Structures are given as C-alpha cells and as structure tokens.
Amino acid sequence: MNYKPFDGTISICDKVALITGAASGIGKATALAFAKSGAKLVLIDMNPAVEDYAKELAEQFSVETLPIVCDLTLSATGKMIVDKTDEKFGRIDILASVAGIGLVDYAVNLTEEMWDKTMLVNAKAPFLLCQAVGRYMIKQGGGKIVAVASQGGVIATDRHVAYTASKAALIGMIKTLALEWGQYNINANLVSPTVVLTEMVERIWQGEDAVLMKKKIPSGRFCYPDEIAAAILFLSSDAANMINGENLLVDGGYTVQ
C-alpha cells in the first residue's frame, strides 16, 4: 500500500464513491455523509426514488451525482455500473456496498426461496459488484472497498439463520479480497453493525423482542444509520490507509460478551 502521512483530516472530498442501497436506510445515510464531505456520488438502488435523492444531494451540497437504478443480482450489472461511472467521472475511488435484505424465521420454518434470496442479495450480489469494481481499481492503481455486514455474521442470533450465513459469507469474501488485492493498493474492509434503526429493521425488531435485544447490548440501545455512515466514511478515507481486511464492529459492545 502507498504511504501518505496523516494530515489531521478525515476527508473524501472529490473522491468518486459508489454507494449501493442509496435510496434508504444505511445507504441513504452514507450518501448524505459523503455528500457533506464533498465526494462525487454514484447512487445505486432498485428503487427509482434514488434519482430524486441524487438530485436533492446535488442541489443541497453542490456535488456531482449519478443515480443508477438497477438490479445488483444480475451478473451484467457490475460492469454496467463501472462503465457508466468511468464515462462520467473517469475513476472509482470508493465502493460502499450497503444494499441487503433481512428475511427472518426459525430454521425449521425457513423456505428454500427465503434462503436463496438472502444469499443472492447479501453475498453473491456484493461479490459480483466487488469483482467488477476490483478489476477496474487494479488497473487504476488502487481504491477503497467497504461492505456492510452485521454482528449477525460474527455471533448467532435466533430466527436469523439465512441472514447470519449470508453475512458470514460476506465477511469471509471481503477478507479474502483484502488478502488478494492489498498488493494493488486496494483496501477491503467491513462495518458490522448491531441492530440499526432503519425501516427494514424496525419491522423485524418490535415489542418485547426489541426490549430483550437492547438488554443484551452493553450500550443499551440500537444504532442509528448515520453512526454506520461515519464508520464507512472513515474506512473510505486516507486515514484508514493501513487498515485492510478489518471487520469494524459498531455494535455497542454486543459481541464482546
């Protein structure tokens, strides 16, 4: 990896950043944090609402944005995203792979369809995009990849067998990319949150389940999307140049027990 003396700032100003899942939740919060930091944004989501959000950020923060509405589970999507980004910006500095799903049920009830969809969205799709971006970054001379996994990929949680398996696969995949691509000045890291208060998660963690889960977290609360965005921004910056293959747990201490 190339060495750059730390200048006292954590900045991604003028960096070209791809963010998946950018229309909602952690991805949306990450796009906001990156826009505030002056990054050039490629906002990716299946939801067409990402187009309006890209326009909003561009107007509010005077940053260049490129919205891409697509299905990340299709094998050709990664190259399409890379080609469109290269055409507009001429480089890719950061990939924040945030998009994911949480289909939960006890193992005895989980359907094959639920298992396959979870693995497709949470493990295979991130790999396909990382592969396409990685090929580009190798030729370019480096870059930063940050994927959002979960504390569930580190420690088991009941009703989450498919989710846990998919996030554990994602963690293993990113660590392997760090091993293979570090020689090309590419950093590949993960952020693994505890329960994050997004619309998707709030549908899962309700009532007594939420109360009991909070009691297991030493910090006593769930996480907010902007707290995860802050961790992603740090790992995307030059301040994290010597961090590679790390799984940064933003879990309020849940996994130390």
Model-derived regions, located:
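Conserved glycine-rich Rossmann-like NAD(P)H-binding loop of the short-chain dehydrogenase/reductase
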Residues: 37-53
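Active-site helix of classical SDR
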Residues: 130, 166, 174
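Substrate-binding pocket helix/loop in short-chain dehydrogenase/reductase
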Residues: 106-107, 111-116, 201, 213
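Residue(s) in the substrate-gating loop at a strand-loop-helix junction
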Residues: 150
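C-terminal substrate-recognition "lid" of short-chain dehydrogenase/reductases
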Residues: 89, 127, 142, 221-256
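Short, small/polar-rich loop/turn modules that mediate ligand/substrate recognition or access, typified
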Residues: 182-187, 243-245
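Active-site loop immediately N-terminal to the catalytic Tyr-X3-Lys motif
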Residues: 108, 155-161, 183-184, 220, ...
